[in-house]
């Protein structure tokens, strides 16, 4: 087992002296986790832009999700609407909430990713833009799935745990 990790480390580190290590950028490619690995078999819930706020709240509750993709057909994306959008709509509008439609609450300029997007780059975008849900689309822009910040964080934690275990095994062997 020690040989395996020595080979891995020597492949990752291509040059070193007593104080510095230089990582081989070609070897870093294999560490890239793709969005596709997180959304395989994951169902995405959608809602119509003409649905009522009542319909939206019920759908969020029934499906146990924090956001729904707004779509007329389950493929094309018109927007995304989340629990935060519902909360933001409430101040000053409590009397008229029964008349509010999803298209009034949704974010129409939707940030999306593809199955080939890296989880690391998606984490950066979600953090910088302060968004918690990103629809996953194919090359034609059709909806495939949705990924949450929780999915991204779990993948990152798993990646760090594997790396920690590998280093621990190497040091202890």
Features from the language model and the residues they span:
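Tandem CBS (Cystathionine beta-synthase) repeat/Bateman regulatory domains
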Residues: 2-173
């Amino acid at each position: 087992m020690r040989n395996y990790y020595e080979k891995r480390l020597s492949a990752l580190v291509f040059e070193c002296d007593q104080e510095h290590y230089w990582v081989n950028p070609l070897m870093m490619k294999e560490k890239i986790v793709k969005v596709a690995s997180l959304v395989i078999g994951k169902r995405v819930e959608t809602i119509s832009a003409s649905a009522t706020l009542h319909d939206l709240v019920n759908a969020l509750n029934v499906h146990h999700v924090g956001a729904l993709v707004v779509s007329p057909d389950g493929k094309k994306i018109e927007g995304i609407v989340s629990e935060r959008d519902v909360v933001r709509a409430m101040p000053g509008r409590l009397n008229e909430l029964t008349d509010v439609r999803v298209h009034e609450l949704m974010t129409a300029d939707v940030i999306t990713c593809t199955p080939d997007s890296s989880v690391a780059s998606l984490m950066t975008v979600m953090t910088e833009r302060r968004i918690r849900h990103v629809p996953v689309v194919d090359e034609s822009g059709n909806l495939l799935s949705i990924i949450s910040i929780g999915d991204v964080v779990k993948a990152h934690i798993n990646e760090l745990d594997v790396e920690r275990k590998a280093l621990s095994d190497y040091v202890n062997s």
